[in-house]
Amino acid sequence: MAISRQSIIYMKNINKIYYQGSKGSYSESVLKSYFPNKQYVECQTFREVVAQAGEDNYGLLPVENSLVGTVIDSYENLIQSELNVYGEFKKKITHALIGLKDAKIENIERVISHPQALQQCSNFLQDMNVQLQPVFDTAGSVLSLLDEESENIAGIAGEHFEGDNRFKVLKKSI
């Protein structure tokens, strides 16, 4: 969880930090915790994060998950680049099933989220017997519910959506 003092000093000079995901994603929450006064830029893919990171800009990539192991896409993109790793952060991930404010868990027919989240919650989802739809990130899956306008679709993301009155946490700690 710690980064070296040398890295901290060097990081004062960065302009932007790129991350994969939408506002409200786990990656953004890591950035807010460790770098509260920097500019964050959303990316749809790990490849985009790596392409944007460089001397004046940093990128944040998830590289390992205690439930499903290595985040292979992150590693592959990092290895193919000439970037250096400057620090490591640990973030406890607690997924929740989230629907629109009037949704009921027994009516959910389709669940959308990042492929890693779908895999991490596979036991819970198997018991639900629902259609799974991978999308580019967890927070984005919940935000997309507003466009879908269906109470039969849910997303998997962090429990912090509980405070947003547009959504309802249908099940915590899945």
Model-derived regions: residue spans:
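Domain-level signature for soluble enzymes in the chorismate/prephenate branch of the shikimate pathway
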Residues: 2-174
